[in-house]
């Protein structure tokens, strides 16, 4: 049986909340407190408008037309050269290795096609999954494409967002194969569901490191 694992990145393989804290510190050092506040205001406005984090769009809205070229480059470098590898969760790499023994592993993430790809590549995760990666603004709207790109007898979805798991489950028929889901209680979305096993997912775990022991 061919099992394809679809794994999210932010707060699933990589501690995005902790990375944002460090990014905020670096932004403040570069821009000052006032302009950093303007950046995060633009960040949330862009996310509300498009339903996805878009760093290039956020940067464009943060810097006014008089911002120097040096400042623009420094801000872009802050994100494009950030050490995301340092924020990979303990046990995440071992989980990927375990899943690859069962079948193909695909990174399936939301985000803009520039920054999100850079984040995943710089973290080293792309190499671990042999370059198999799909990035969409809203991945739950692309099950037909996912199924066509990675046909399988069965799918395993691992994500930290309850809403993503619910939407994948509701549209599972589009994958042309049954789907098993794992909710990982990491990051800010962990508080969205009550403590204990969540009935919306096949499995609920506290850490990405728990996957090998749970699946055996």
Residue ranges and their predicted role:
Residues 57, 80-106, 140:
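Short, acidic loop-to-helix structural element flanking the phosphoryl-transfer center
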